[in-house]
Amino acid sequence: RLRFNALTCIDTIGGEKVLFLKPQTYMNLSGNAVAPAAAFYKLPPEKILVVCDDISLPAGKLRLRSKGSSGGHNGLKSIISALGTENFPRIKVGVGSPDTQGDENAVINWVLGTLCGKDAELVDHALNSAADAVSSVICEGMDTAMNKFN
């Protein structure tokens, strides 16, 4: 269902009602989807779990954090700006990074392109692990999930 500039779905994980939100904005405007949904459902930032890609992590690596800066990620920058805080948990999925020598558009092409070969396999596996990490955060808490998945 399209609401808040996002595809939304409500489901239950471990007995907890969960709103899934996939912004339909450009990445650098993700906060325009997250903040209205958070306001509507009266969700404090610490109850918002963001899953995003991260080019600073090797392909397939997960990193869970309970809060932090954007790390240069434009989607996270937008969410931080819209919520007015960095204090929300996130799961970062490593997608690796391109060789940028001589190509100023290499990073843009990398994150907007399609992964192939071993990187694609690693990221596919990481996405399955990220889904398990989401369940772990909801059912067991962030500290336990960080110990399991970091």
Give the positions of each predicted feature:
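Hydrophobic alpha-helical segments within soluble ligand-binding/sensing domains
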Residues: 72-75
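Nucleotide and nucleotide-moiety/phosphate-recognizing core
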Residues: 1-67, 77-92, 98-109, 113, ...
